[in-house]
Swiss-Prot record:
GO cellular component: membrane
Lineage summary: Eukaryota, Metazoa, Chordata, Craniata, Vertebrata
Keyword DNA repair part of the UniProt annotation: no
Pfam family, one: Cortexin
Protein name as catalogued: Cortexin domain containing 2
Membrane topology type: Single-pass membrane protein
Transmembrane spans: 20-40
Subcellular location: Membrane
Keywords on record: Membrane, Transmembrane, Transmembrane helix
Superkingdom of the source species: Eukaryota
């Protein structure tokens, strides 16, 4: 009977390692999606994206 109680408590408990792994995978996918959109924007119009860093005067 004690073994059954331990098994049920383990299934109802929060697995911290699994939570960290899922959170890490989700964050990596979000980062990759953001990078894909930024790269597509750069490929579509490279001059508009780089114009903010190249606005230095030529004096």
């Amino acid at each position: 009977m004690c073994v059954l109680m331990e098994d049920s408590s383990m299934s109802n408990g929060i697995d911290v390692d699994k939570g960290f792994a899922i959170a890490f995978v989700v964050l990596v996918f979000v980062f990759l999606i953001v990078m894909v959109f930024r790269c597509v924007k750069l490929v579509k119009n490279p001059y508009e994206v780089s114009s903010t860093t190249a606005d230095l005067p030529l004096n």
